[in-house]
């Protein structure tokens, strides 16, 4: 701490002292440090306190003491910098627009080293409060001086290395030209030295070193060319306080580091830029662009604390007092920062980010790009997250909104078949690709295709003739072997192709109308009748809402009678809307053709939702054209041990019975079932038995 005792004179004489000192006068002011993102010096603060003494007279030679925490700078250096700052307009003050009136109000200016006094070259003790007002009014005006003094007396902030705003500072003599030139050279020399100090300090302080260092270099070049002193540079924050935008000189705001030795005053009332606490994002702010006034700046999101709001730069992210984790002062918006090129920063995880991303798209915005950008964004996000990830609800929303092929997103996901203990489908080869056959890991569609709306007089041979051009196939329909009929009884049939590539060719030849595929087929009496083609996409067999939850077979239900067009995503949404807590849904498919069998599974994340689902017993599935009543019961496994004896009373065999009553919900061997359910109140419980392994119906395939 440097103590400077100055007699009443035009020249300031410095004297070092380690004791605290007071500034004689009638008004006291307390100072708090305010850092600027464009300031290249270490943040310092000065404290000035007034002693309860009467002001001296005109002839008094009472010395005044000014205490600065200015490191290596002397008062002469500071006074020399006062001259140049008067004629240099400042940008980036609070509330947006020109910051000069606000800065001149307190006689402070940003010269790259901090806010300093403008347009003064001497310090003198003020003989009286009226004379002080008269001396300052010549420069500011009576109203401005009154407002300034009221602000200082009310305990307002006082920026570092600032003499402006004190009641006993007389601002009068204009500087000479040679003094201004000397001031500029000295200022640039000091700025270069302190910038090196800040660079060394940031290596230990800020995790955003590379981005901020790049930012300081850009701002240094702009200051030398005069670009950063644009009078109309927008600033951050709002309100009438001159300290709302403490980031003078940076048009878009920035995340300014605060040294650990400098505490932030608890008296802040407006917007104050804080450094990001905890794990800060890496250097994602490297993209520069030019604003409307031609000054380049980086689109760095600024975290605004308190009740500041309103106008400011486009990069401002307002954070209230809410939030959690290691940064409780951050609002929920922090996890959803996006860089200027539309790439989303990973702050709150994939689901939270994409939910906000898709919400913006649903409100009419472009969501950061078109469908192709959404596609690349999804793939980049999956690559950043790392590891196998399941499809989430936000992913499906992105697929639906972008209008792209869902397989593009699913190619990056691994939703392979789990073990026998998992309720996943045991045949779910979602491995992506652009075609191929079953078994080669690149299939996208089932080789079984539904054809509806056939002419009533069309037979099997005519159907085969109509679709043979796409590849070898077999025509099948329900109960074909028993009926011994050559005509599909209900106007629909299934095409069983030998190769999955034939399905791709069929889809390419179809006509699309309202997301449905049609192809013209002729019969002996009807020419070119449009029939519906409904292929089954393998990706629609599984859907995961919450990839962080492990699937528990004891919290999984079996849904019977599921309509074949119903997808796993649609089943999950229906069950989650009814009971909540759904983390997975799957559609049972046959092991050979991978086509839905008319049943599904839904896994819940909590016991309450599971019990509510099995207690309802029946559910009405309503989705689009689908309106069907389906049965819900516990999902029974055939490889579970008895929960009572753990295989000791049954020779280590798997338990054949499962009690679905909410008072039991356990697996039992035959012995334990008889013992437990002979008790009062349980004699009416009925066991559920796992049916045999899924076996496809034997079809005498003869590829035509």
UniProtKB/Swiss-Prot annotation:
GO terms for cellular component: axon; axon terminus; cell body; cell cortex; cytoplasm; cytosol; dendrite terminus; neuron projection. SMART domains: RRM. PROSITE patterns: RRM. Phosphorylation regulates interaction with Tob and oligomerization. Protein phosphatase 2A keeps both Orb2 and Tob in an unphosphorylated form. Following synaptic activation, unphosphorylated Orb2 is bound and stabilized by unphosphorylated Tob. Tob recruits activated LimK which phosphorylates both Orb2 and Tob and enhances Orb2 oligomerization. Keywords: Activator, Amyloid, Cell cycle, Cell division, Cell projection, Cytoplasm, Differentiation, Phosphoprotein, Repeat, Repressor, RNA-binding, Spermatogenesis, Synapse, Translation regulation. Residues 163-240 are annotated as: Gln/His-rich. GO terms for biological process: asymmetric cell division; long-term memory; male courtship behavior; male meiosis I; negative regulation of cytoplasmic translation; negative regulation of translation; positive regulation of translation; protein stabilization. The keyword Transmembrane does not apply. Residues 447-538, 555-637 form the RRM domain. Pfam families: CEBP_ZZ, RRM_7. It is found in: Perikaryon; Cell projection, Axon; Cell projection, Dendrite; Synapse. Broadly expressed throughout the nervous system of embryo, larva and adult including the ventral nerve cord and brain (at protein level). In early embryos, deposited maternally and distributed uniformly throughout the embryo until the extended germband stage. By mid-embryogenesis, highest levels are found in the central and peripheral nervous systems with lower expression also detected in the ectoderm and mesoderm. In adults, high levels are present in the head and body of both sexes with higher expression in testis than ovary. In the ovary, expressed in both germ and follicle cells. GO terms for molecular function: identical protein binding; mRNA 3'-UTR binding; mRNA regulatory element binding translation repressor activity; ribosome binding; RNA binding; translation activator activity; translation factor activity, RNA binding. Disruption phenotype: Substantially reduced viability with surviving males being completely sterile due to a failure of spermatocytes to complete meiosis with arrest happening at the G2-M transition. Defective spermatid cyst polarization. RNAi-mediated knockdown in motor neurons decreases number of synapses and accumulation of the tumor suppressor brat at neuromuscular junctions (NMJ). Simultaneous knockdown of the tumor suppressor brat restablishes the number of synapses at NMJ. Residues 1-64, 82-106, 166-266, 417-438 are annotated as: Disordered. Monomer. Upon neuronal stimulation, forms stable amyloid-like oligomers composed of isoform A and isoform B which are required for formation of persistent long-term memory. Isoform A is critical for oligomer formation. Rapidly forms amyloids and toxic intermediates are extremely transient. Unlike in the adult nervous system, remains monomeric in the early embryo. Interacts with the translational regulator bol. Lowering pH destabilizes the protein filaments. PANTHER family: CYTOPLASMIC POLYADENYLATION ELEMENT BINDING PROTEIN CPEB, TRANSLATIONAL REGULATOR ORB2. RNA-binding protein involved in translational regulation and required for long-term memory. Required in mushroom body gamma neurons for long-term memory in male courtship. Binds to mRNA 3'-UTRs. In its monomeric form, acts as a translational repressor of genes involved in neuronal growth, synapse formation and protein turnover. In its amyloid-like oligomeric form, acts as a translational activator. The monomeric form reduces poly(A) tail length and destabilizes mRNA while the oligomeric form protects and elongates the poly(A) tail and stabilizes mRNA. This is Translational regulator orb2. It comes from Drosophila melanogaster (Fruit fly).
